[in-house]
Each structure stands twice: as C-alpha cells, then as structure tokens.
UniProtKB/Swiss-Prot annotation:
This is RxLR effector protein PexRD43. Belongs to the RxLR effector family. It is found in: Secreted; Host cytoplasm; Host nucleus. Its main location: secreted. Keywords: Host cytoplasm, Host nucleus, Secreted, Signal, Virulence. The keyword Signal applies. The RxLR-dEER motif acts to carry the protein into the host cell cytoplasm through binding to cell surface phosphatidylinositol-3-phosphate. A motif (RxLR-dEER) lies at residues 44-56. The keyword Signal applies. It comes from Phytophthora infestans (strain T30-4) (Potato late blight agent). The gene is PexRD43. GO terms for cellular component: extracellular region; host cell cytoplasm; host cell nucleus. Residues 1-16 form the signal peptide.
Length: 129
C-alpha cells in the first residue's frame, strides 16, 4: 500500500502541482484616485468626484413630514416640551383638545393645537433641537 502511494505521488511532485510556489501569487495595491488626495479639512474623501456636488441635509430634516409648513414647524417647536410631557402621559390629541377647552380656549385654537400635536406625534424627535 505504501509503495502504491509513493508511486502515485512521484508524478505530482515532478510536475510541480503539489507544491505551493509563492512567486506565483501577486498582490494588488490599487487605491482609488479620490482616496489618495486629502481634502482641505484633513479628511480623505470616500466619494467619487461625480458625487461631490450632491446636496447634504441633516437627518431630522429628512425625517420631517412633507405636509408640515414652516409656520406649523415653528409652532410645534415652541410647544415641543409641552407635547413631550403629553406624550409621556400617553395623552392623545383629543385629550389635549379637552384640556384646552376646560382652560377656556376657543374650539378653533384647541383644534389647531390638537392638529399640531398629531403632527408632532408622527415624528417627535424631528421637532426637538
């Protein structure tokens, strides 16, 4: 049995297929041209030059709802702490409406506050700065 294994392994050693030759392996040291240059701030750019003029915005502005106007946005930001307290108590827009009516506010102002609170509840973190 041992003789058969030796006889079978001799042609493999002679042809060179059994041994690993490290000279056949080459390493590639390719680096992106954009990653080679350091920008003015001392950071490397990981984007291609074609994407350089893409506009950037903060994440919380991307999360805002499209139907929230600037006036509503400023009103919600003014009332954000109050809305956060209501949210912690698990109060809804109807609870806010009833509370404002008991305090003597008009139906219209209480309804508007309830609508603002509903928009606040859809994404509360977008209104806290």
């Amino acid at each position: 049995m041992r003789l058969a294994m030796i006889l079978l392994s001799i042609p493999l050693f002679v042809s060179g297929n059994v041994l690993h030759v490290p000279t056949q392996v080459t390493k590639s040291h390719a680096v992106s041209p954009d990653a080679q240059f350091v920008v003015a701030m001392g950071r490397r750019s990981l984007r291609t030059s074609g994407e350089a003029n893409e506009e950037r915005t903060r994440l919380n502005t991307l999360l805002l709802l499209d139907d929230v106007t600037e006036a509503e946005m400023s009103s919600i930001k003014k009332l954000a702490l109050t809305f956060a307290k209501l949210e912690n108590r698990n109060d809804g827009a109807a609870d806010l409406f009833n509370m404002l009516r008991r305090q003597g506010h008009t139906k219209e102002s209480a309804r508007n506050a309830g609508n603002l609170y509903t928009k606040y509840l859809q994404n509360p973190s977008a209104f806290h700065t």
